[in-house]
Every structure is written in structure tokens, then in C-alpha cells.
């Protein structure tokens, strides 16, 4: 029996929309990872985001320690891997995991420390832009490092496994439509947007006052919705990935093509979506700055404590095993 990994894969929404939304994932409700199917480089980033929704530091550390098993489970859920492919996935992902843990997590901790410092002072427009650029840079580092191994694995994917992937994508797309009320009335879509924003803010800063909720709802309502275009862009990325798999006849060129596709993920957007991106991004910046300015001292302290908990987790995870034993 195949297992459902959609909840884990769905973490991609937090990254896929990070440059137009830049709000962390809601605890217990990760976003949509497979919207663009960046396979095993995005897989690592997505699981990190999913682990960040766990309650408590020890759970995050436990989840990251089992990352290779979680990743294999997720890949199998989408591709229905055979035994040989699973073994190869474990071997290659273990190398990526080792590199990421000891080379990248210290940088993530430093990045979060800088974010925490900016949050403590109060966010300005340039701070939000800086965070977005930092996320982009770290994604590209991950994509460049993992693209060759991902390409090697993708060369083994069969037509039957591609059909399994399409079926799983169909489920993901239907879930996106359902959660964002794309098949509902404009009023239903608006209510869903407001609820999602309130849930995300509350998850990071704690309870909101009625006045804050009203102000946040007004900010969301004032900004035009681009969810239908986002959905179409997800499907565009899925089509591109399938087209990329058709180019595997030349194994020597495929890794470079995959790497370019992973990094230039905005290339090929529909003209209307591309045209609206600058406005959507500016709206999101204004939203985040406005929310930051309405935070009470207690809410700001809640946010900085949560950021610090992730800093502590990443720092501890990046310690070599010998150092951890000594510290204990």
C-alpha cells in the first residue's frame, strides 16, 4: 500500500510563495512543496521547513536526525521507487544531508540571528528584502550542490513512475484549489486569504487583539489576490519538469539542464503573472512592515523567542557527534 506524504511535501508553499508572501508556515499546516518538483534539493529545504512546524526543539532535532528516512519515504510516495532506486536514493541523499548539516546549518543559524536582531529593532522595507534575498541565495546553494545527484536518480525514473508522479500531482493540485477556495466565490477566496494570514501571524507572535485582527484583515483584503495565477504557475512548473524528463536521452547534458531549471525557477512565467509580481511583492513587504509595527512588546518577544529556538536547534544539529557527547 502506498503511503500519503502530501502533508510533508506540501511544505513547499512556504518557500514557493516566500518571495510574494514571506510569512513562515503555519504550525501543523505546511505549504505546497511539489508545486515545482525541485526533487531532492528542494526536498531537503522543504523538510527543514516542515520540521520547523514541530512543537519543541527536541522534536525538530529528532526529525532532522531522521531526515534520510523521511526523504526516502517522500520520494517513494511520489515516484513509487523500486528497491534499487531506494538504495541509491539513501546513498546519495546521505551525502547531501551530511554536507547540509555541517556546512549549511551554521550559516542558517547565523542568518536567523541576523533576522532576530532586525526583528528586535523593528522591520523596515530593506529588512524584508534582505531576508528574501537571503532565502534565494541559500536555495541556490542547495540546488547547485544537489543537482548532479538528483539528475543521476531522475535518469532511472520509468514511464510508469512518471504516471505515478502525475497522479500525485493531481491530488496536490486539487488540494491547492480546495484550500485556497479557487473553485468558490470571490468572498470565499477572500475569507480563506484572511484566515490564512491571521493563522500565520498568530502562530509566530501569539494571540492577536480584535483590533489587530481587523487591521490585518483589511491589509489582506486591500491587496489583489493572485492565487489563481499561482495555481497556474505551479502547473506550469509541473509541465516544465515533465518536459525536462523527456530530455534525459543525453545523460551528459541532463544535469546542467536540471541545475538551470532548479535555479531559474521563475523563468517562463505567464506574462500576466510576471507583470503582477512586482506589485504583489511590494504589497507583501508593506503587509509585513505594517504587521511588525502593530506588535506589542509581548508579541515581539514571542517571535524572537521562537527564532532563538531555531537558532539553538540548528547550532546543536551542526555540532559534530564527538562535540555533542562532550557537551552532554
Predicted feature locations:
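Bacterial signal peptide processing site
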Residues: 58-60
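Tryptophan (W) side chains
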Residues: 8-12
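C-terminal motif of bacterial Sec signal peptides marking the signal peptidase cleavage site
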Residues: 54-56
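Short, structured motif recognition centered on aromatic/hydrophobic residues
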Residues: 75, 88-89, 146-157, 165, ...
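Bacterial N-terminal signal peptides that target proteins for export
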Residues: 34-44
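A cross-kingdom marker for long, charged
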Residues: 72-73, 231-328
Amino acid at each position: 500500500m502506498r503511503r500519503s506524504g502530501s502533508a510533508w511535501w506540501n511544505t513547499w508553499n512556504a518557500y514557493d510563495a516566500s518571495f510574494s508572501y514571506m510569512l513562515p508556515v503555519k504550525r501543523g499546516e505546511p505549504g505546497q512543496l511539489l508545486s515545482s518538483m525541485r526533487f531532492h534539493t528542494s526536498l531537503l529545504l522543504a523538510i527543514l521547513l516542515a520540521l520547523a512546524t514541530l512543537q519543541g526543539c527536541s522534536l525538530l532535532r529528532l526529525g532532522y536526525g531522521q531526515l534520510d528516512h523521511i526523504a526516502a519515504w517522500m520520494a517513494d510516495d511520489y515516484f513509487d521507487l523500486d528497491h534499487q532506486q531506494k538504495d541509491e536514493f539513501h546513498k546519495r541523499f546521505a551525502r547531501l544531508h551530511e554536507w547540509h548539516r555541517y556546512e549549511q546549518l551554521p550559516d542558517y543559524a547565523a542568518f536567523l540571528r541576523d533576522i532576530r536582531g532586525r526583528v528586535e529593532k523593528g522591520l523596515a522595507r530593506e529588512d524584508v528584502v534582505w531576508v528574501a534575498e537571503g532565502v534565494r541565495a541559500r536555495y541556490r546553494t542547495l540546488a547547485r550542490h544537489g543537482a548532479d545527484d538528483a539528475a543521476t536518480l531522475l535518469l532511472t525514473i520509468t514511464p510508469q513512475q512518471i504516471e505515478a508522479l502525475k497522479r500525485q500531482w493531481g491530488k496536490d493540485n486539487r488540494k491547492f484549489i480546495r484550500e485556497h477556495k479557487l473553485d468558490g466565490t470571490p468572498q470565499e477566496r477572500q475569507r480563506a486569504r484572511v484566515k490564512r494570514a491571521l493563522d500565520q501571524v498568530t502562530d509566530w507572535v501569539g494571540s492577536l487583539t480584535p483590533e489587530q485582527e481587523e487591521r490585518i484583515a483589511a491589509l489582506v483584503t486591500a491587496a489583489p489576490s493572485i492565487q489563481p495565477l499561482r495555481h497556474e504557475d505551479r502547473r506550469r512548473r509541473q509541465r516544465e519538469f515533465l518536459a525536462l524528463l523527456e530530455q534525459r536521452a543525453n545523460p551528459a547534458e541532463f544535469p546542467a539542464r536540471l541545475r538551470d531549471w532548479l535555479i531559474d525557477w521563475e523563468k517562463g512565467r505567464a506574462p500576466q503573472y510576471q507583470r503582477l509580481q512586482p506589485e504583489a511583492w511590494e504589497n507583501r513587504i508593506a503587509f509585513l512592515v505594517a504587521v511588525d509595527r502593530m506588535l506589542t512588546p509581548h508579541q515581539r518577544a514571542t517571535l524572537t523567542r521562537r527564532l532563538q529556538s531555531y537558532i539553538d536547534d540548528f547550532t546543536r544539529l551542526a555540532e559534530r557527534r564527538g562535540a555533542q557527547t562532550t557537551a552532554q
